[in-house]
């Protein structure tokens, strides 16, 4: 009896969802449409900003070109600080794309009360408000640092699992599983909590009252994007760096 109840409780918990999803049915698949729809908005913002900044490039930058150059310098310094002068260039596009996508997604979630926008079914939300998005970004990061290690060291990359002593093999394997989990849940939890608090306050009180909290949400959203991109760079650097280099660092 207790076993059957525990199984029922497990399945009831597994069926719980955060928010009301806007489902798209494609073939036999059911996907979260709000993630794709708002992701398109994020892509559109980034593409339009890039075109506007590079349409008329001037030797003395001004306006949006000046802003874009500042962003590029910031991303270059971020990648260089994590990967070093020799290794950062090939990985700058990946780390920069991660940062910009997460940053714009987070700010859209902090600035726009998506949950108050009524749809025939479900609700809109920032892409990073969905655990599937954050897990996908974390898995991409995992694939990136595995690729970095294998491309530089070949199959010898996996020898680090046996260092400094083979008995640590289970812990090293567990560490590689916890890296994407920590990245995804940290980002998901922070963005979801911020959106929920702002949505509830906007619903209960006049818009002026939640403004300070929205400003704090903007700061937190930027920090989360920076943390994710920084850790991604650190993990890739760890995969590229040999044990000999670590000892002399």
From Swiss-Prot:
Topological category with respect to the lipid bilayer: Multi-pass membrane protein
Pfam families (UniProt xref): ATP-synt_A (PF00119)
A GO cellular component entry from the record: proton-transporting ATP synthase complex
Entry keyword set: ATP synthesis, CF(0), Hydrogen ion transport, Ion transport, Membrane, Thylakoid, Transmembrane, Transmembrane helix, Transport
Keyword Nuclease: no
GO MF annotation: an example: proton-transporting ATP synthase activity, rotational mechanism
Location in the cell: Cellular thylakoid membrane
Residue stretches spanning the membrane: 33-53, 92-112, 131-151, 196-216, 217-237
Family affiliation: Belongs to the ATPase A chain family.
Its job: Key component of the proton channel; it plays a direct role in the translocation of protons across the membrane.
Cross-referenced NCBIfam families: ATP_synt_6_or_A
Subunit structure: F-type ATPases have 2 components, CF(1) - the catalytic core - and CF(0) - the membrane proton channel. CF(1) has five subunits: alpha(3), beta(3), gamma(1), delta(1), epsilon(1). CF(0) has four main subunits: a, b, b' and c.
Protein name per the record: ATP synthase subunit a
Origin organism lineage: Bacteria, Bacillati, Cyanobacteriota, Cyanophyceae, Oscillatoriophycideae
Gene that produces this protein: atpB
């Amino acid at each position: 009896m207790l076993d059957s109840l525990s199984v029922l409780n497990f399945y009831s918990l597994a069926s719980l969802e955060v928010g009301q999803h806007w489902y798209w049915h494609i073939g036999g698949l059911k996907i979260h449409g709000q993630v794709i729809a708002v992701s398109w908005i994020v892509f559109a913002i980034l593409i339009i900003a890039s075109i506007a900044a590079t349409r008329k490039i001037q030797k003395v930058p001004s306006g949006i070109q000046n802003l874009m150059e500042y962003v590029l310098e910031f991303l270059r310094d971020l990648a260089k600080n994590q990967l070093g002068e020799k290794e950062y260039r090939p990985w700058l596009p990946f780390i920069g794309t991660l940062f910009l996508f997460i940053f714009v997604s987070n700010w859209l979630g902090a600035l726009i009360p998506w949950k108050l926008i009524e749809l025939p079914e479900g609700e809109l939300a920032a892409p990073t408000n969905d655990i599937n998005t954050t897990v996908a970004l974390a898995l991409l990061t995992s694939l990136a640092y595995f690729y970095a290690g294998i491309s530089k060291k070949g199959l010898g990359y996996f020898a680090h699992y046996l260092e400094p002593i083979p008995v640590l093999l289970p812990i090293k394997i567990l560490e590689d599983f916890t890296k994407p989990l920590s990245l995804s849940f940290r980002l998901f939890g922070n963005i979801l909590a911020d959106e929920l608090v702002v949505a509830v306050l906007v619903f209960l009180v006049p818009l002026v009252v939640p403004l300070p909290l929205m400003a704090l949400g903007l700061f937190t959203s930027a920090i989360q994007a920076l943390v994710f991109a920084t850790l991604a760079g650190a993990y890739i650097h760890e995969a590229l760096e040999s044990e000999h280099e670590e000892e002399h660092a």
